[in-house]
Structures are given as C-alpha cells and as structure tokens.
Design a protein with these regions (language model features):
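Conserved beta-strand hairpin/beta-sheet module of binuclear metal-dependent hydrolase folds
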Residues: 2-55, 156-168
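Hydrophobic/aromatic beta-strand patches that form the interior of the parallel beta-sheet core
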Residues: 6, 61, 91, 127-129, ...
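Residue-level detector of conserved, well-ordered beta-strand and adjacent loop positions
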Residues: 9, 31, 130, 136, ...
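Fold-independent oxyanion-binding glycine-rich loops
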Residues: 11, 41-42, 94, 131, ...
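Short Gly/Pro-enriched turn/cap motifs at secondary-structure boundaries
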Residues: 18-20, 124-126, 146-148
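Active-site HxH/HxHxD metal-binding segment of metal-dependent hydrolases
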Residues: 23, 44-136, 140, 222-229
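Metallo-beta-lactamase
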Residues: 36, 106, 134, 141-236
C-alpha cells in the first residue's frame, strides 16, 4: 500500500536561555494503514497518537533535540505499550546528545522515585541519525540530511517517492527556522539550507516544523537575501 502523510498541529511552550516561548508545531505521520513513522512528535502526545490510531509506530524521528519535541517522544514511542521492549525506536542526531541529556536530566531531578530518576538519567536514543541514513516505510524511503545550525544536530528528511522535504526547524516558509526569533548559529544554518536546497527539484514540497508548507523553488529564491540576517547578527 502506498505511503501517505498525515499532519498534526500542536501548541506548547519551550524555554531557551531562561526565556519561555509559545510554539505551534507540525508533526508528520508517514505510512500506510498498518505501519507509520512519526516525525517530530511535539507538545501533545495524545493528539499525535489519536492521529496514529491503531497503526504500529515503527520509529520516531526527532529533527532536533529541543524540549518541545522531546517532551512527548517517550509516550509516542510507547504508543500505549507498557513493555519497553515493544516501544518504537527513537532516533536523534548525536550532535544533539547534550540537549537530550539536559532535558531528561531535568526530568530526573524532578522525579521522586530514585529508580525512575536513574532510568531517565541513563536514557539514550535507540538510533543515532547519520547523514545519508535511510528509513523505509510503506515502500517509501526517508533519507536523513544533517543540517546543523538551528541546533548542532538538526536534520531534514527527504523522500523522493513522496516528493517531499521534511525541513524541521531548519527551514520555515519564508525564513530560516527559529524559536521566538532566536537563532543558535544562523550563519551555519544558512549554509546548511543552501547546501540542502541547491540539488533538489524546485517543485519539491517542503513541510516545515512550524507554519505552512512551501516548495524548494520558493525558498531557494529567497535564500540569498537571508544573508543580511546573519550580517545583522554579527553587527549587533
């Protein structure tokens, strides 16, 4: 059966540099009537799992390690299963390991049960994403592209079969992706976006981590003008 893409929009909060920002995030569920891969379950696990329904979650891909994505990842991977051996594998790029450890370390400090706290502190992703890595679901391939800048371990996901680029928070419609207008390493992010877009078909759909969809051609035409954002940041 051919793969399809379901989208879930959720809202939540994320804290960066002691500032709290409200975010509206896109989660994408890729698969068929039986099996799916979930890309960026954010903010609201219940809403994501409702969209998954009775289908089996085969993997959970996080395009970066920011807290609004990690906050639901265990619940979505479990998908109602109590036995951890039956949970879907969680995938994250190793360069965001510090963000992962910081988030679950904070959860551990809030946990009253010491065994549970120890488990949270020792928790690691099941799969470390690598540039060029491929997942398969419902006869579609999902290729990982490392796009550092938004975070050190940010990735995008390309599927030629589905004609789509899942750009996470690396690239939003009309601008480089950011949370609350805050950029981690904008120059590196812009370089990643340029390298990402250049070889891709101009009509390829772009499904971002926040906001409306766009196309490679639309964003490629805007890319050079974004260099002013990086220069302004250096002059500030």
């Amino acid at each position: 059966m051919d793969a399809r893409i379901d989208q879930v929009v959720t809202t939540g909060k994320v804290t960066l540099d002691d500032e709290e920002y409200e975010v509206e995030s896109n989660t994408y569920i890729v698969g068929d009537d039986d099996e799916v891969i979930v890309i960026d379950p954010a903010n609201d696990a219940e809403a994501v799992l409702k969209a998954v329904g009775e289908r089996e979650v085969m993997a959970v891909i996080c395009t970066d390690g920011n807290e609004h994505k990690l906050s639901t990842v265990l619940e979505v991977a479990a998908a109602g299963e109590e036995d951890e051996e039956n949970w879907a594998p969680i995938a994250l790029h190793r360069a965001d390991r510090l963000l992962w450890r910081d988030f679950f370390g904070r959860l551990a400090r809030e946990e009253e049960d010491e065994d549970d706290a120890t488990a949270l502190r020792s928790l690691e992703p099941d799969i470390w994403l690598e540039d060029g890595g491929v997942f398969e679901i419902a006869e579609a391939q999902l290729e990982i592209v490392h796009t550092p800048g938004h975070t050190p371990g940010s990735v995008c996901v390309i599927s030629e079969q589905l004609g789509v680029l899942f750009s996470g928070d690396t690239l939003h419609r009309g601008r480089p992706g950011a949370i609350g207008g805050v950029y981690d390493d904008l120059r590196k992010q812009l370089n990643s976006i340029g390298a990402l877009l250049t070889p891709l078909p101009k009509d390829l759909r772009v499904l971002p981590g926040q906001g409306d969809e766009t196309t490679v051609g639309e964003e490629d035409a805007r890319w050079e003008s974004w260099g002013a954002l990086a220069r302004d940041g250096e002059d500030a």
